[in-house]
């Protein structure tokens, strides 16, 4: 069974999927978030229809003191919606620096700042998911 990585942002959500052996992660896509959990649930259902997913791996951006950020509170609300709609397990991973890592990778690949915006969130989801896969091998 595969894992779905989720980088939940205030305006965009990045998605990544594991391979069938759960060895590596692949960036899937970004989803523009307008505050509608219903649209996110519909999008995730499309992933579930296409892939056999048993767990959602969600980035949880704690601050440098290990405390919840404002985004964590939104993610907590998002998790309530996931639990109401799906049976998959949910695992939170501290992802305080995944977006920064994603930006660095895109910069090193000589991708211009304007195009980085289109790729950063799904790359952050890929990093979150890969960190999880590496941790639980």
Swiss-Prot record:
InterPro entries given in the database record: RNaseH-like_sf (IPR012337), YqgF (IPR005227), YqgF/RNaseH-like_dom (IPR006641), YqgF/RNaseH-like_dom_sf (IPR037027)
UniProt keyword list: Cytoplasm, Hydrolase, Nuclease, Ribosome biogenesis
Hydrolase listed as a keyword: yes
Lineage top rank: taxon: Bacteria
EC category: hydrolase
Main location: cytoplasm
Keyword check for DNA damage: no
GO biological process: rRNA 5'-end processing
Gene3D superfamilies membership: YqgF/RNase H-like domain
CDD domains linked: YqgF
A GO term from the CC aspect: cytosol
Subcellular location: Cytoplasm
A GO molecular-function descriptor: nuclease activity
Documented EC number(s): 3.1.-.-
Function per UniProt: Could be a nuclease involved in processing of the 5'-end of pre-16S rRNA.
Assigned protein family: Belongs to the YqgF nuclease family.
PANTHER family: POLYNUCLEOTIDYL TRANSFERASE, RIBONUCLEASE H-LIKE SUPERFAMILY PROTEIN
Protein name from the UniProt record: Putative pre-16S rRNA nuclease
